[in-house]
Amino acid sequence: LDTDSTRITSSFNYFPDSELQNLIRQVNQTRAYYKKQGFDEVYLSIIPNKTSIVAPKMGRYNHLVERVQQNSMLKTPFIDSWTPFVQHSQEVYSLSDTHWNCKGQAMWLEAVNHYLSEPKFSILNHSEQNL
């Protein structure tokens, strides 16, 4: 399904800039909504499908993940799984299907933990802000 360009989930499905802008607006609106509901922050983490990492040259690749993450309209902080997945492309997905394997899951979790362990997320800083 990742390679069938007629399906919206395909890495080769045409995704025009107008749809990209709409998608980013919706992501930003979702973040604003949940922040208004009391969440400290909302993050975006796009898990790239196997074809976009392992075989992007099988067709006319739409670069959707990169286009979202690099778009200046995106106000929602994102946790980048694209970069480490590309660097370890043959190691992060199951051989027999399109799902990520334990290494892929661990790499994503490591990226999340690294992002959340930055100084702005420390308990001390959070406590001081609430005084």
Residue map of PLM features:
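Extracellular glycan-modifying ectodomains
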Residues: L1-L131
